[in-house]
Amino acid sequence: VQTYFFRRKNINAAGNARSWTDHLLWHHAAHTVDLFAYQCGEDISECYGVQGPIHPQLGIAMDMGIVCKVPSGSILTLSLSFNNDGPLGSFFRYICDNGTYKAFYDDLSDGKDNKIDVSKVDVSMDGIELEDREFIAAIKEKREPNASLAELLPCMHVLGKLESIVDPQRKAHA
């Protein structure tokens, strides 16, 4: 998976200043590491990571590489960078045994740039609406919602282990 942005200032996608600093590991890698474990249906058994230098003003690493493995043998190789000099926004490339997929916001294409229609995948293209629908349904059905805090904890443990590898002194949080 490639997760690439261009970031030199502490601003959001709309160009507005943030009161917090974005982070490759604790924000962007979290999405992919969690998705990988979810899709595999297994907890991550091995992980390793490296990061580049800490940006002097932002106080975060601008580049990172992560490898994870589950007991059945599937692996995740994740490359993250805030040094991608491209349009505002992000793109994601997913490579698997079922093909190559590129996502940019709500657009999805295959590895040859053929658009994939995702408009009929769910009742809405709005991710926030879908999260809200799932949460309300879980309350009505008296069940744990998909993507609950409990389901996220294994991912947080993996990220903690990765942080201890790439930033053992927690310099990026000083």
What residues fall within each predicted segment?
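Generic structural signal for secondary-structure transition and capping sites
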Residues: 1, 41-45, 75, 99, ...
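Predominantly a Rossmann-like dinucleotide-binding segment in NAD(P)-dependent oxidoreductases
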Residues: 1-50, 54-56
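Active-site rim elements
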Residues: 22-23, 119-122, 143-145
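A generic structural signal for residues located within well-ordered alpha-helices
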Residues: 28-31, 130-131, 150, 154
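A general structural signal for well-ordered alpha-helical segments in protein cores
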Residues: 32-33, 129-136, 159
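NAD(P)-dinucleotide binding in Rossmann-like oxidoreductases
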Residues: 51, 56-61, 71-133
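Short beta-strand scaffold segments in enzyme catalytic cores
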Residues: 66-68
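C-terminal helix-rich "cap/oligomerization" subdomain common to oxidoreductases
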Residues: 71, 135-174
